Design a protein with these regions (language model features):
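Bacterial carbohydrate/catabolite-sensing allosteric modules
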Residues: 32-34, 58, 65, 183-193
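Glycine-rich phosphate-binding loops that contact phosphosugars or nucleotide phosphates
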Residues: 35-151, 155-165
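Short, small-residue-biased leader/transition segments that mark boundaries at the very start
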Residues: 1-3
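Hydrophobic packing residues in well-ordered alpha-helices of helical domains and bundles
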Residues: 5, 24, 49, 171-172
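A short, charged, Gly/Pro-tolerant segment at domain boundaries
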Residues: 166-193
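A short, well-structured juxtamembrane/interface segment
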Residues: 15-33
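Glycine-rich phosphate-binding "P-loop"
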Residues: 7-16
Length: 193
């Protein structure tokens, strides 16, 4: 095993050891309570944010990554429902993005629950979050490892499923039937004149 693989494994182990089961369950409860989940991330954090979105969508949760550059679109999405029905998941590691921090502060100020995936308890987004999970992301003195965040996302998805938050088989069957009917509406050749 090469030294970088060992370092990645140690980073993941450190992350899993540093987050209690209670913290992980609190994060999954926040997911369960939210009608809509918003994910904010920038630069390095966008990869784990995309993976988190993929995993949450596979659990049939309503979520989206916010485009931090499209402020009017962000505002439209965030204001489409009462703030208490949403959840902002802020993902940030050094250098912390000003837009991610500003959005986190805004959501906290309007009463939207905030959860954070970050590297330190004193990170700017952790100060605004009700639930914070810490990830070891530094290898060889640089922020360059997202293995621990991806591992933590997988852990959260499994916990969500194991704590009965995932759709039942009956719900999945009904959704699959609706999906097939939806697809069949578009399977006929276009007959418009």
């Amino acid at each position: 095993m090469c030294s970088s693989d060992l370092a990645e494994r140690e980073a993941l182990q450190s992350t899993l050891d540093g987050n209690s089961v209670e913290l992980l369950l609190a994060f999954t409860q926040a997911l369960r309570r939210a009608r809509r989940i918003f994910i904010a991330a920038h630069d390095f954090s966008r990869f784990p944010a995309g993976y988190l979105e993929h995993r949450l969508l596979s659990l049939e949760l309503d979520c989206c990554i916010l485009d931090l550059q499209a402020r009017q679109d962000m505002f439209r999405r965030l204001s489409a429902q009462p703030p208490q029905d949403g959840l902002l998941i802020a993902i940030t590691v050094p250098p912390y993005g000003n837009d991610t921090i500003a959005l986190t502060r805004y959501c906290a100020s309007i009463g939207m629950p905030v959860a954070a995936l970050t590297d330190r308890p004193d990170s700017p987004v952790a100060r605004c979050a009700q639930t914070t999970l810490l990830c070891h992301v530094e290898l060889m003195g640089m922020t360059n490892s997202f293995t621990s965040m991806v591992g933590l996302v997988d852990t959260l998805a499994m916990l969500y499923t194991f704590t009965s938050g995932a759709p039942t088989q009956e719900e999945k069957t009904c959704r699959d039937t609706l999906h097939r009917k939806f697809d069949s509406c578009f399977s006929d050749p276009n007959t418009s004149i």
